[in-house]
Swiss-Prot record:
It comes from the Eukaryota. Signal peptide: none annotated. Keywords: Endonuclease, Hydrolase, Nuclease, Nucleotidyltransferase, RNA-directed DNA polymerase, Transferase, Transposable element. This is Retrovirus-related Pol polyprotein from type-1 retrotransposable element R1 4. It is an enzyme of class 2 (transferase). It comes from Nasonia vitripennis. Its EC number is 2.7.7.49.
């Protein structure tokens, strides 16, 4: 038999008092475990020194152990099996990491170190024209990322701008791997493109569901959900409804992702219901406006001019999709039958409103981007040839 994750809190007004009580507690635990034929693991036993924050006026100030005055940097000396227990900057208890200030920075760091490498490796297996498809990546996301981040969220997650920024940075890296969009794509657009709630809203949903399962009322986005024993499913649906309302308000208020919002996905609920939308390397560029477009590359100082090499017009996703004469043949064959020759945003909305429309967009994006690359390569070779003749 074995037991796991035992936590002991020892209080004291001085270091000597804590050490005295701590030694007595350790001795008592070892004796009790021995009586039932259990051993306490010396290598897995760690401690953390939590110092009471000092109060300046009416505000508590967090203590950094490295900045403590004389005697503050020395670890407590409490032995187990003849060896001093190691005192760490952060510890893990029941799967949740916390630091000396009982904050969640350590847990966020743990999530980043665990999840980012995993999805980075998956990104390598999901290249633009081969490897894992969007459906497989989405399944891994729902089965690995969401449960891992939301685990015990009712105990560690606290709403706050700093916390949300850390978690959103982590989430953004994962979404880029799933949607195969460019790294310059905003977090707001990446969430909508993937059809998944922003992570801070997802955590609020997880916390609300936890309280409802415990038979308690839940609060999300300022809305109180009254627990009804006979209607837990209805309670969950109401939580998700409020979460989507929060997401929609956030999407409409965002100053980022304009190309995605105005042309393709003004409504987040409609996007989530459109399960036929499975972004790849090519469609992500069209749906976000971030990609192989001179206008965007010029903004990033990666292209000499913002104009299209074919017609001289601003080279962006809308021009590429509906206007550039170089791709008229592909457009007439694939896009026009779906859009009916309408202009944006009616035409672009029609391309994502049905499986047939998105299939046409996907094929057009693939062949048109390949054609564009060939045209630019031919133009580059021509310019190099002219330059060589001029030098001769």
């Amino acid at each position: 038999p074995f037991a796991d994750d035992l936590a002991v809190l020892v209080e004291g007004d001085s270091r000597a008092e804590i050490e005295k009580v701590g030694k007595a507690v350790v001795k008592h635990i070892v004796e009790r475990c021995s009586a039932i034929k259990l051993e306490v693991s010396e290598s897995k036993t760690v401690g953390i020194f939590v110092k009471k924050p000092k109060v300046v006026g009416s505000k508590a100030v967090k203590i950094n152990r490295k900045d403590c005055r004389k005697g503050g940097a020395r670890n407590l000396k409490i032995e187990l099996g003849g060896k001093s227990i190691s005192f760490e900057q952060s510890v893990r208890y029941l799967g949740v990491h916390f630091d000396a200030n009982l904050g969640i920075s350590a847990h966020c760091k743990y999530l980043r170190e665990k999840l980012v490498p995993l999805f980075s490796d998956l990104r390598k297996l999901a290249q633009c024209q081969w490897g894992l498809g969007h459906k497989a990546l989405e399944t891994i996301y729902k089965g690995v990322f969401v449960p891992t981040v939301c685990y015990a969220s009712a105990r560690w997650y606290k709403e706050g701008a700093h916390t949300d920024r850390i978690l959103e940075d982590l989430h953004r890296q994962i979404l880029i791997a799933i949607t195969r969009c460019y790294r310059s794509t905003s977090y707001e657009a990446a969430c909508v493109l993937a059809g998944t709630l922003p992570i801070c809203i997802q955590l609020r949903v997880s916390v609300a569901k936890y309280h409802l399962r415990k038979g308690e009322d839940a609060e999300i986005g300022g809305v109180v959900i009254r627990r009804r024993p006979e209607g837990l499913k209805e309670n969950y649906n109401r939580v998700l409804e409020v979460a989507n309302e929060m997401w929609q308000a956030r999407w409409e208020a965002s100053e980022q992702g304009n190309a995605t919002r105005e042309l393709f996905f003004p409504d987040v609920v409609a996007r989530v219901k459109s399960d036929w939308i499975r972004p790849d390397h090519f469609t992500s560029q069209v749906l976000t406006g971030h990609g192989y477009y001179n206008e965007k590359l010029h903004q990033l100082s990666l292209a000499k001019a913002a104009a299209c090499i074919c017609c001289g017009e601003p080279d962006n996703n809308l021009h590429f999709l509906l206007e550039c004469p170089a791709f008229a043949e592909f457009r007439d064959e694939l896009i026009t039958p779906v859009s009916g020759g309408l202009e944006a945003p009616e035409a672009t909305l029609m391309l994502v409103s049905s499986p047939e429309g998105f299939a046409a967009l996907k094929e057009y994006s693939r062949v048109a981007f390949e054609c564009k690359r060939q045209l630019e390569n031919a133009l580059t070779e021509s310019d190099e040839g002219l330059s060589s003749e001029s030098e001769e």
